[in-house]
Each structure stands twice: as structure tokens, then as C-alpha cells.
A protein has these predicted regions:
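Conserved C-terminal "switch" segment of AAA+ ATPases
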Residues: 70-90, 167-170, 187, 201-271, ...
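Walker A/P-loop
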Residues: 43-94, 117-122
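Single conserved hydrophobic/aromatic residue that forms the stacking wall/gate
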Residues: 1-7, 12
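C-terminal engagement/docking regions of AAA+ P-loop ATPases
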Residues: 39, 173, 251-340
């Protein structure tokens, strides 16, 4: 899978731990089927990627798709992959949870049955199949919690019957992605169903630099003698600073303790890309005004960070603390105190 990241969005760069776990869950069972049988080891039925939004869950799933499409799987179960078998390619079926919700009675259940029927048909030909469900929390919400509708309470049993039913899911694996794992019905997450749960958290400093490196490259208009990687490092260290200039607000946890929240605490791969895009947009506008290629400089990048910081800080005054903390994968927050 890691080799396929080159062709994917690089907001998952340097996520070796997450990639390693999903490789063990998805790639190993398909590539070494005979060894799994030799050790009487059942591959997991499903994997759940969860964590705060904008940090590469869907991109990791795309990397899985690329790996499947490249082939190289043990189609006959003898553990050997011959040149001919190398062309046995996997199938990746992708759907967003909200797309399956339908106001007509029984229609959502029919769509779920159809997806798994297609998966079984393709798996019967010896192709490994991954069914990817994005925004899984919108489809499989906890029953009886007061946040699920009548439609959703019938969808969960249908989904579970596809996983556990009489028709086996040989050669089929389900991957789900969710920002709100707390809203998914616990029955879906029990052992024997979505066995592997992988948290895709916020990027650390070195990961953030690798992400920005993908969008700040040496072929862009830069000042003479300026290295794009050095610009990335300067940008990230500005974002991850914990001084007053990057202070968003103070938050009160359930135990009553207050602590400061900084821009670094809410950063995501999507935010990093957005900041770089802000700087590029500024450069484009200045280039239009001057008729020259305006270089991406430290001051230009700093201005982009400042714009992102101000927008994020101002938005904190209007959020619901409990809901905001859940969506962003944080411990529960009782109150938010912003600067006057």
C-alpha cells in the first residue's frame, strides 16, 4: 500500500503506523492467503478508520484502492504469485453513507443488499474486493439513542445481516471511515465485524512538513536561493507555535479544568493545504497587478497563516462546545472562553 501513496493525495505522508496496520488488515490476507489458512487465521471482516476530519482517512482508503488495482494477489490459495497471477486485480467499491439513505421504505436496505451482492459476484471470480463506506456514522447510527431515524434503525440490521448472514463474505472486506465513531451503533463495532479500528489523528510537526512539501515545491515561483522545503518548515513552525499570537481560546473540560487551545490543536491536513492555497492566491493576485511572477515568500506564507488563524479564532465564538469537541475528536468540553 505504501508504494501506492505516490499516486494518492499526500495528506497521508509519514503515516507509517496507520499504513502498517491497514496493510496487515487488508493486504496481507489477500497476498498470503495460503499462510493464513496454514495458521488457521481468519482475516478481519472490516476496518474502521476514524478520527478528526481532514486528516486523510479517505486518502488512505484510496491508497488501498490503488494497491488493489495494481494486483499481485494469490488467486488460487497456494501462496505463490506467478507472473500470470500478478495480474489478478482487486476490486474497490466505494460509496458515501448519505447516498444510501432514502426516504422510501426499504430502498436503503435494497441498496445495501445490492452493494454486497456486487461484492460477492466479483469475489467469486477470485478477485479481492474492498467495500468502502465513507461517512459511516451517517448510515449506521446507534439505534435507540434519539439521534437515529426509523430508516436508520432498519439499515443497521440489514448491514449486520450482510456481514454475518448465511451467504459468506469470502474474499470481501469492508472499510468504513467516520469522524464520529461515537455515533456508530456498537453492534457494528463488535469483534467479528469491524475488527480493526485505526485512529487517523492530527499530523505531528514532521508529518505536517511532509504534507506541505507536497504543495510547496521547487518548481513554483520562489526567491533565488530559497529552498521549498525550508519554506515548508518555516510555515509549519509558525502554525505549531504555542505563543499568544496563535492562541485560539480557553476551554473547560468536564473535570472543570481550563486550558489554552492553540491553532496547532485543531490543525489538519486539509487546513495545511488551505493555508498554502491562500498564499498561492495572494501571489496570483499580486502577479496580476504587477504583470510579473510574484515569488512565494516567508511574509506571504505568514500572512496566509494569520488569515487562517483569525478565521478559526473568530469561529470559536459561535460553536457548541460539546458538539465541536466530538466532531474534532477531542475530550468533551463544557465551555469555551474566547478573548474579548
Amino acid at each position: 500500500i505504501s508504494a501506492c501513496l505516490v499516486g494518492s493525495e499526500m495528506c497521508i505522508r509519514d503515516r507509517d503506523s496507520e499504513i502498517g496496520r491497514i496493510r496487515d488488515a487488508v493486504q496481507l490476507p489477500f497476498q498470503h492467503r495460503a499462510l493464513f489458512e496454514r495458521y488457521d487465521l481468519k482475516p478481519p471482516k472490516g476496518v474502521l478508520l476514524y478520527g478528526p476530519p481532514g486528516n486523510g482517512k479517505t486518502m488512505i482508503a484510496k491508497a488501498v484502492a490503488n494497491a488493489l488495482c495494481e494486483g499481485g494477489y494469490d488467486s488460487n490459495g497456494d501462496g505463490a504469485i506467478s507472473p500470470a497471477e500478478t495480474h489478478v486485480k482487486g476490486v474497490f467499491l466505494s460509496v458515501k453513507g448519505p447516498e444510501l439513505l432514502n426516504k422510501y421504505v426499504g430502498e436503503s436496505e435494497r441498496l445495501i443488499r445490492l452493494i454486497f451482492q456486487r461484492a460477492r459476484e466479483r469475489a467469486a471470480n477470485g478477485n479481492p474486493v474492498v467495500v468502502f463506506i465513507d461517512e459511516m456514522d451517517s448510515l449506521l447510527r446507534t439505534r435507540g439513542s434519539g439521534v437515529s431515524s426509523d430508516v436508520e434503525t432498519t439499515i443497521v440490521p440489514q448491514f449486520l445481516s450482510e456481514l454475518d448472514g448465511v451467504e459468506s463474505l469470502d474474499n470481501v472486506m469492508v472499510i468504513g471511515a467516520s469522524n464520529r465513531v461515537d455515533m456508530i451503533d456498537p453492534a457494528v463495532l463488535r469483534p467479528g465485524r469491524l475488527d480493526v479500528k485505526i485512529r487517523v489523528g492530527r499530523p505531528k510537526t514532521n508529518q505536517a512538513i511532509a504534507i506541505v512539501d507536497h504543495y510547496l515545491t521547487d518548481d513554483l515561483p520562489l526567491e533565488d536561493g530559497v529552498d521549498a522545503h525550508a519554506l515548508s518548515a518555516v510555515l509549519v513552525h509558525d502554525i505549531y507555535g504555542t505563543s499568544e499570537r496563535r492562541h485560539l481560546c480557553d476551554v473547560q473540560e468536564e473535570n472543570g479544568q481550563w486550558h489554552a487551545l492553540f491553532l496547532a490543536d485543531v490543525v489538519s491536513g486539509a487546513m495545511l493545504k488551505n493555508i498554502v492555497d491562500r498564499a498561492k492566491t495572494r501571489a496570483v493576485k499580486e502577479s496580476i497587478e504587477t504583470g510579473l511572477d510574484v515569488a512565494l515568500t516567508v511574509p506571504l506564507l505568514a500572512a496566509a497563516v494569520e488569515d487562517e488563524y483569525r478565521e478559526t479564532r473568530d469561529s470559536m465564538a459561535d460553536v457548541d462546545p460539546e458538539q465541536w469537541s466530538r466532531i474534532n475528536g477531542m475530550d468533551p468540553i463544557r465551555r469555551i472562553r474566547t478573548a474579548e
